[in-house]
Amino acid sequence: ATHDQRDIPTLIDFYNMLNQQPEPEGRMLAVTIERYVTGQASLFNHPTNVNTHKRFVVYDIRDCADNMKGLALLILLDQTWNRIVRNRERHVRTWVFIDEMQLLFENDYAISYFDQLWTRSRKYGAIPTGITQNIERIINNEKSRLMLANSDFLVLLGQSASDAAALGEVIKLSERQVAMMRNAGPGEGLLVAGGKIIPFENRIPTDSAIYRMVTTKLDDLIQYSNEDGRGDGARRG
């Protein structure tokens, strides 16, 4: 069976039905969810305006209000898990990349949901990958620390002295390996795979097209923008 995307019920339909209930409990529940139906918190009270069935989907909550990020995380994690389940039924593998992973661990509900997703994903043919520049938050949370310790594949770039020492304890690194992380330069670090730990060097020349494509350094971006005639410096001339 097929359906029109515009006919899918949204939260306001549920809200209206609650208000029509003769029992006072229904109206009390309607009052409870009212902030998510009207006003600034009604972000998810609308049909989706993007195609989530594409092969490559990116979710970004950077501009989401702080009081909505917890709800946003839960909705996106649920959407991701549903996609993993659907892909498994189609015998399709799913790659899940979570940037700024430490943000998930600011919300207790998101932590629990993400812990289940991370633990069950491999059985469903998914490969979850977490990315963070703040390893301290990961280590200080019990669930995320266990996730880190039980991961089969890790890429560890340069770390501060305290973070390197803490990582060494969690994943059982030698003193020499901890020192390598402390002294690692750009593109250098340790590769942990299947119980093996290998130092690596993968520097990208700063004058290459790949470097220009992947750099996030503000000075680089300003320089490239000016070279293209799009930066403030270029416009001021």
What residue spans do the PLM features occupy?
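Glycine-rich loops and low-complexity Gly/Arg-rich segments
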Residues: N82-R86, R120-Y124, F153-L156, A179-N183, ...
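Short, exposed beta-strand "edge-strand" segments with a Pro/Gly-rich flavor and a Y/T-containing core
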Residues: A1-D13, R55, G158, A166-E175, ...
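Short helix/loop capping segments that flank catalytic or ligand/cofactor-binding pockets
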Residues: N67-K69, P199-N202, Y211-M213
